[in-house]
């Protein structure tokens, strides 16, 4: 039974958006552009699906998010559709999936703690803005200088607020759909998002990052080719 589960885990995968947008994919696939990387990714998935029956899923919400990102970053419609043709788009059955109450409780506690940290970050930057206002009074500084100072404070606020409230935490419907779908189909979640993977693993879902996923697929393809050669040699000598 354990062997059968392992075999299933090796051939069922659910992708989140980062599985297609990870900046390391270009070098791993030997591509000079994102468009070329998507085309090579499509060829790789197609090959292992044909050779091993590997199943690759993606929720509709993730599909739309990935599509918007890729098409706005130089990927052609043809390349994206070539990739999407080998991915099964399936929504999770949200009304049937059960999540343990302890996990929901831990998640709510983390949200509360992060909101408190975010509030402290906001308060700190309000104080900085107030102090800067005294240093850059209208009669002693140009409008451009005040704008630059305020812009620097706002950028710092955004960066630190994002770090305090979102980094390392599941924070979108798209990510949640990917986790739920992986739980439903009993597959491996492919994501480079620390928070998404942590939430998935709390539910017992195995997760790997995109480079590992590429490595697994390439390994399967190499095994398929060497196995095919071995079978041909055995047949010729018999």
Swiss-Prot record:
Keywords, A to Z, come to: Endonuclease, Hydrolase, Nuclease, tRNA processing
Q: List, alphabetically, the PANTHER family matched.
A: RNA-FREE RIBONUCLEASE P, UPF0278 PROTEIN TK1425
Instruction: From the UniProt record, list the reaction(s) this protein catalyses.
Output: Endonucleolytic cleavage of RNA, removing 5'-extranucleotides from tRNA precursor
EC numbers: 3.1.26.5
Function, as annotated: RNA-free RNase P that catalyzes the removal of the 5'-leader sequence from pre-tRNA to produce the mature 5'-terminus.
Q: Does Hydrolase count among this protein's keywords? A: yes
Q: Indicate what this protein is called per its UniProt record.
A: RNA-free ribonuclease P
Q: Name one GO molecular function term.
A: ribonuclease P activity
Membership in a protein family:
Belongs to the HARP family.
Asked if the Swiss-Prot or TrEMBL record annotates the protein with the keyword tRNA processing, the reply is: yes
Q: Its Gene Ontology biological processes? A: tRNA 5'-leader removal
Organism annotation = Hyperthermus butylicus (strain DSM 5456 / JCM 9403 / PLM1-5)
A Pfam entry, by short name: PIN_5
């Amino acid at each position: 039974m354990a062997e059968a589960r392992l075999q299933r885990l090796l051939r069922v995968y659910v992708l989140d958006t980062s599985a297609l947008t990870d900046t390391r994919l270009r070098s791993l696939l030997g591509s000079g552009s994102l468009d070329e990387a998507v085309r090579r990714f499509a060829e790789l998935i197609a090959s292992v699906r044909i050779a091993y029956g590997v199943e690759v899923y993606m929720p509709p919400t993730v599909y739309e998010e990935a599509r918007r990102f890729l098409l706005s970053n130089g990927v052609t419609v043809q390349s994206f559709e070539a990739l999407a043709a080998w991915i099964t788009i399936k929504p999770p059955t949200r009304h049937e999936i059960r999540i343990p109450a302890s996990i929901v409780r831990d998640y709510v506690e983390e949200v509360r703690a992060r909101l408190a940290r975010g509030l402290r970050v906001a308060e700190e930057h309000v104080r900085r803005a107030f102090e800067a206002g005294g240093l850059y009074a209208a009669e002693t500084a140009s409008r451009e200088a005040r704008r630059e100072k305020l812009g620097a404070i706002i950028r710092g606020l955004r960066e630190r607020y994002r770090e305090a409230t979102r980094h390392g935490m599941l924070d979108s419907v798209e990510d949640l759909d990917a986790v739920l779908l992986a739980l439903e189909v009993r597959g491996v979640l492919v994501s480079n998002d620390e928070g998404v993977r942590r939430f998935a693993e709390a539910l017992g879902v195995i997760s790997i990052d995109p480079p590992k996923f590429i490595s697994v697929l390439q390994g399967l393809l190499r095994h398929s080719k060497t196995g095919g050669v071995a079978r041909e040699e055995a047949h010729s000598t018999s």
